[in-house]
Design a protein with these regions (language model features):
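Non-heme Fe(II)/2-oxoglutarate
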Residues: 2-94, 119, 126
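Catalytic core of non-heme Fe(II) oxygenases with the double-stranded beta-helix
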Residues: 87-202
Length: 202
């Protein structure tokens, strides 16, 4: 059986964002699997995405070990593949939250030699609002939604480059977006494995 991972954890970028480079031992095998999945359009995100699909037990175990080191226990993980082409657009947002659980997102970049600026960025709104909890406290969701596509209203506080076989994990309550899209089809587009990770403190 092939070894699945090279699990080298890098220094955290911020309290809420960290990276594992060279996550898969054989990333082209995972990429080939992703290329052969069925993708569908949905109204709530750009690009096309698979349904929630089977997750490799080894990946689950690695994530479980990683989050335990932060005193967090995984309750569930939703696992998808997604790709976006250059003719699509994105917006700044936070992900849906299950109350009583903290939610993290994970992205594994699966396009070889991708543009470095095709990664992921975290943002702060002009009023200092950084996440859904701030938005609820300040009761300014209408302003946030109205300006989700206006970059002049946001300050970029972290960005992560699109490096093949890199996993980035971040707190999905925080405002974020993909950066540049690229490519024309699944073969050369921004292909990724997308994880939504639901955790609770130990």
């Amino acid at each position: 059986m092939d070894k699945l991972f090279n699990s080298r954890l890098t220094r955290p970028l911020t309290l809420n964002t960290f990276i594992i480079d060279n996550i898969y031992e054989n990333p082209y095998k995972i990429r080939e699997y992703a290329l052969n999945q069925t993708y569908e359009h949905h109204s709530y995100h750009p690009g096309v995405r698979t349904n929630n699909i089977y997750m490799q037990p080894e990946l689950y175990a690695l994530l479980e070990k990683t989050f335990l080191s932060y005193n967090l226990k995984i309750n569930d993980i939703h696992n998808y593949f997604q790709y976006n082409t250059a003719d699509e657009y994105t917006w700044i947002h936070h992900d849906n939250v299950i109350y009583g659980e903290e939610t993290y997102a994970g992205i594994i970049y699966l396009t070889p030699n991708a543009p470095i600026l095709g990664g992921t960025a975290m943002y702060k709104y002009i009023d200092g609002n950084m996440n859904k909890l701030d938005t609820d406290l300040l009761q300014n969701k209408p302003n946030i939604m109205a300006n989700a596509k206006d970059s002049s209203k946001w300050l970029k506080i972290t960005q992560v480059g699109n490096i093949f076989n890199r996993l980035v994990i971040y707190n999905s309550n925080n405002y974020h977006s993909s950066m540049e899209y690229f490519g024309n089809n699944i073969q050369d587009a921004r292909l990724m494995q997308l994880l939504f990770i639901y955790v609770k403190p130990l």
